[in-house]
Amino acid sequence: MFLVNLLILIIPVLLAVAFLTLLERKILGYMQFRKGPNIVGAHGLLQPIADAVKLFTKEPLRPLTSSIYMFILAPILALSLALTIWIPLPMPLPLIDLNLGLLFVLSVSGLSVYSILWSGWASNSKYALTGALRAVAQTISYEVTLAIILLSIMLINGSFTLTTLNLTQEYMWLIVPTWPLMLMWFISTLAETNRAPFDLTEGESELVSGFNVEYAAGPFAMFFLAEYANIIIMNALTVILFFGTYHLIFLPEMSTTTFMIKTMLLTSLFLWIRASYPRFRYDQLMHLLWKNFLPITLVTCLWYIMLPTTLSGLPPQM
């Protein structure tokens, strides 16, 4: 039965990822005054299926000098981790209700660094290795801010369980008292998922395509799916943390629908940002985190530690 539930979770995620690529191309198209994909199917709706067929029917080429096992394992690991993070998410009920759900999400997202590092190192290409090292440095750096923001939210929530956040936000979304944290969290998720304007790992002008430059066909598609699955998961997590997942007084049955609408709106904002802003310089990227975000998040975390004691209030309990 658990396997059936797992499949019911994974298949819609993969479908959502496939159609997110179409949504991105459509949004970028309309923002650049063109139509985007409109040939395959009505209004280009079958384009993701055509792309998948094309990629998975091509021959997966491998450089002769590459490390074969790591080269093959890296995309499999990337996609597996991207799908694993969905397990503790309450939508409105999680697949497994973990006591330390947020810690699990943070740990698994941290492991995705290894897939990037392996792919860059195993490709035996200077462009891939440079892109991988950039990606690893960027991901590890921004995870520091994400962890401190999560700790601040957990101090308000009183538990590491994700389902408790629904009770915490029953009367007011957490974005209202913690909007500076939300802004820093959103920018950090952009950097964590290597999206524009933080897509330095895939700088076409300098690194050809970044850490996945030597990949083609199926393995490339797996990296692609992992990247877009991470975008959706980060936005779903943003909704759970700051926008109250399923509390809808008049229509409690519409909980999953409202959750997905909020996630889709935030994901569209990711794509809008890609179309609007140029790429950061690498030193600016690191300066933003270590000299701006880190001190602010540490101060706010200390503030939330002192707040319950100062006001003699207790965090909500299950």
UniProtKB/Swiss-Prot annotation:
What does the UniProt keyword field contain?
Answer: Electron transport, Membrane, Mitochondrion, Mitochondrion inner membrane, NAD, Respiratory chain, Translocase, Transmembrane, Transmembrane helix, Transport, Ubiquinone
A GO molecular function for this record? NADH dehydrogenase (ubiquinone) activity
Reaction(s) catalysed (UniProt annotation):
a ubiquinone + NADH + 5 H(+)(in) = a ubiquinol + NAD(+) + 4 H(+)(out)
The terms describing its cellular component in GO are: mitochondrial inner membrane; respiratory chain complex I
Chief site of localization: mitochondrion
Q: List GO BP terms, alphabetically.
A: aerobic respiration; mitochondrial electron transport, NADH to ubiquinone; mitochondrial respiratory chain complex I assembly
EC assignment: the record states: 7.1.1.2
Residues spanning the membrane: 2-22, 68-88, 100-120, 144-164, 171-191, 231-251, 253-273, 293-313
| Superkingdom | Eukaryota
Please give, as recorded in its UniProt entry, the membrane topology of this protein: Multi-pass membrane protein
Give the enzyme's main class according to its UniProt record, as a single word. Answer: translocase
List the subcellular locations: Mitochondrion inner membrane
The protein's role, per its UniProt record: Core subunit of the mitochondrial membrane respiratory chain NADH dehydrogenase (Complex I) that is believed to belong to the minimal assembly required for catalysis. Complex I functions in the transfer of electrons from NADH to the respiratory chain. The immediate electron acceptor for the enzyme is believed to be ubiquinone.
Protein family per UniProt: Belongs to the complex I subunit 1 family.
Question: What is this protein identified as?
Answer: NADH-ubiquinone oxidoreductase chain 1
Organism name: Ornithorhynchus anatinus (Duckbill platypus)
As recorded in Swiss-Prot or TrEMBL, the protein's gene is named MT-ND1
